[in-house]
Regions:
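FMN-binding flavodoxin-like domain, especially the glycine-rich phosphate-binding loop
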Residues: 58-64, 68, 82-167
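N-terminal beta1-alpha1-beta2 submodule of the flavodoxin-like/Rossmannoid cofactor-binding fold
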Residues: 1-103
């Protein structure tokens, strides 16, 4: 909270406390609008629902915050070497096809991704807490270094959608 207060003195800050919001992390029929109950690829259907303006209000609100953001700060405890399930579910529901990825490069005809995704121009700072110290989480630690542990998030989620991760 202190960080939010400090940043708020110089910047417009929007926060999301997924637990306090009661955010449902499960991507399902409620995210699909008219396509609910129709067999198919959930991610593609969520993208169609986004394009049709049929995503649930809580997802639309999170997308609006992200669309307006220059900097995304993800703060979470490291659970089983990754983000908590509720945050993973936030990625699944909010970073939809056609919003965060999936646009085709007009010259190449292939999806724009890895630094060229739908959220290009935004940056992220990942802040984690862990129950281990540098003897365990470090270059010579049994768990490996933190950069490697976070690679699926920093590269596979953030960079894929165009968000540059700050060191």
């Amino acid at each position: 909270r202190e960080g939010v207060e400090t940043l708020s003195t110089r910047f417009e800050v929007a926060t999301s406390d997924l637990y306090a919001q009661g955010f449902d992390p499960v991507l399902g029929d409620g995210d699909l609008g008219d396509l609910a109950g129709v067999p198919g690829n959930l991610a593609a259907q969520a993208g169609e629902s986004y394009a049709a303006g049929q995503l649930p209000p809580e997802v639309q609100a999170e997308q609006a915050k992200l669309a307006a953001a220059e900097l995304l700060i993800l703060q979470f405890p490291l659970w089983w070497y990754g983000p908590p399930a509720i945050l993973k579910g936030w990625f699944d529901r909010v970073l939809t096809d056609r919003f965060a990825y999936g646009d085709l490069d007009p010259e190449l005809g292939v999806p724009r991704r890895y630094g060229d995704g739908g959220l290009t121009g935004r940056r992220a700072l990942v802040v984690v807490t862990a129950g281990e110290d540098e003897r365990s989480i470090g270059p010579r630690g049994i768990s490996g270094d933190l950069e490697s542990l976070l690679f699926p998030l920093t590269h596979g989620v953030l960079w894929y959608t165009g968000i540059e991760t700050l060191d």
